Every structure is written in C-alpha cells, then in structure tokens.
Amino acid sequence: MLARFPLYLRLVRMDKPIGSLLLLWPTLNALWIASDGHPRWPLLVIFSLGTLLMRSAGCAMNDYADRDFDRHVKRTADRPLTSGKIRAWEAIAIAVGLAFVSFLLILPLNTLTKQLSVVALFVAGSYPFMKRFFAIPQAYLGIAFGFGIPMAFAAVQDTVPTIAWVMLIANIFWSVAYDTEYAMVDRDDDIKIGIRTSALTFGRFDVAAVMLCYAVTLGIYVWIGVTLGFGLAYWAGWAAAVGCALYHYTLIKDRERMPCFAAFRHNNWLGGVLFAGIAAHYLLAGS
C-alpha cells in the first residue's frame, strides 16, 4: 500500500494544486463577504480542507470516467489509472473515501449547509460524464467549482442571499473562460476521440468566447463592488484581475498549446488578486 501511495497522490493531483486554488478563491470570496470580512477560523479550516478533498475526489472520479479516452490524449496517457498502474476500483474507493471525509468536516455546521452539500456532491460526481453529451461541460464545471459559494453563505448566515447566486453565476463564466483555455490544449486529441468541449463548440470563436466570459465575470464583480460599497483596495484588486485577463488574451490569441496551458494556470493569479482586493477592503475598513 505504501508503495502505491505516490500513485494515489498523482491520481488526486496533489502534485498539481492549481485546480484546488481555482476552487478556493471564490469560496474565500464568499466567506469574507458573508461574514463582513471576519470569517471564523473553524469555517476557514473546514472550507479550505473541504475544497482540497472534494477537488481530489473529483479528480479520481474524472479519471475513472475518462479512462478509455485519456489513453488517446498525449497529455493524459500516463495518468496512473489510464496507464494501468492502479485499478478502476481503487480510483472509485479513493473518490468515495475523500467525499465521505469532506462530509464529516461539515457535520458541525447548520442543516442548510449540509443540504447544499448533497447537491454539491451530486454535481461534482456527475460532471465527468457531462462531456459525453453536453456541448459546454465547462459551464457545469463552474457550478461544481463554485458551489462552495452558496455553502459558505449558508454556513455563515443560515441563508443564501441573492448575491451568493450572482457570485456563482460569475464563477460559471470564469470557469468557462479558464477551462476553455485548458480545452484548447487538447483540441486535436478531443476531435479524434469525440469528446465534447467548449473549445470545440466555440470553434473559431473560441478566443472571443473566452474574453467574453472574462468580461461577464469581471462585470459581475463590478456590480458586487458597487452594491457592497467597496473601496479603492477592492478596485485595485479588480483592476489587477482585468490585467490578468488581458494578459491571457496575448497567450491564447494564436491558439498554441503551451501558451494556452500557461493562460489556464495563470488564472490562479486572477482569482488571487480578486480575493486580495476583497480581503484588503475589509481589513482597511476595520482599521
């Protein structure tokens, strides 16, 4: 078992934390806004660990669902499950185990948060199969990656206000943007194996679609900033996020694999500066 542990870590992408961070930033945004900038540390621990565990469970489930496709894709052919280094039942067991531990984390929280966690589990578990028939599975991914937002509001306020759902919509558009960049890397392979992705659905308008999704995301955060009366610190973070989006355009405009992958990874900075703006606003407002 110990000899297989490094393979299990690779299965759940512990060597690639970018996915966990893309889940974490919007969840932290929600925790800070829901608590007026003073989130309780137990909630920070629960949601941070839950984000890591559920993303890891999702990776294991995704590799199980895509095991017959991934062997035909250059980037994924050497994944532990695809290459036969671990078995399918092991991936399922790991996914179920991690999801169960995630549920144990939220047991101290209120009933509404637990109810929302059931929905979140269903969305996360069903996402890997969306690529079979949904033309833009990245939108469904945005729901899965963003469901920590309504859960955070529920945990803090015992209700899910309108702003939480608006933030979730922003996260859906952001997810379509960065995961389309990711899909642009595998475009040729995905055409051969018949998988549906937003990069293929958007076709020659893929770059325009990515930038439009960034515009909608950042436009929604303008509404959030104005509605909540955020100050200059927030707008500095927002402006930095705009700069990130414009930088991504320079990377993806020629549709080359490695620059598109670099743009995807750089979304960690976009999410990070948005959160930094929110946190800085509350920090300065309370000083």
Curated annotation (Swiss-Prot):
Catalytic reactions of this protein: all-trans-octaprenyl diphosphate + 4-hydroxybenzoate = 4-hydroxy-3-(all-trans-octaprenyl)benzoate + diphosphate
EC numbers on record: 2.5.1.39
One of the protein's GO biological processes: ubiquinone biosynthetic process
Biological pathway: Cofactor biosynthesis; ubiquinone biosynthesis
GO MF annotation terms: 4-hydroxybenzoate polyprenyltransferase activity
Membrane topology: Multi-pass membrane protein
Co-factor requirement: Mg(2+)
Subcellular location: Cell inner membrane
Enzyme kind, highest EC tier: transferase
Gene3D superfamilies for this protein: UbiA prenyltransferase
GO cellular component, one term: plasma membrane
Claim: Cell division is one of the keywords in the record: no
Domain of life: Bacteria
Keywords: Cell inner membrane, Cell membrane, Magnesium, Membrane, Transferase, Transmembrane, Transmembrane helix, Ubiquinone biosynthesis
Principal localisation: membrane
Residues passing through the membrane, by range: 41-61, 89-109, 133-153, 158-178, 202-224, 267-287
Function comment: Catalyzes the prenylation of para-hydroxybenzoate (PHB) with an all-trans polyprenyl group. Mediates the second step in the final reaction sequence of ubiquinone-8 (UQ-8) biosynthesis, which is the condensation of the polyisoprenoid side chain with PHB, generating the first membrane-bound Q intermediate 3-octaprenyl-4-hydroxybenzoate.
PANTHER family referenced in this protein's UniProt entry, alphabetically: 4-HYDROXYBENZOATE POLYPRENYLTRANSFERASE, MITOCHONDRIAL, PRENYLTRANSFERASES
Family, per entry: Belongs to the UbiA prenyltransferase family.
Protein name: 4-hydroxybenzoate octaprenyltransferase
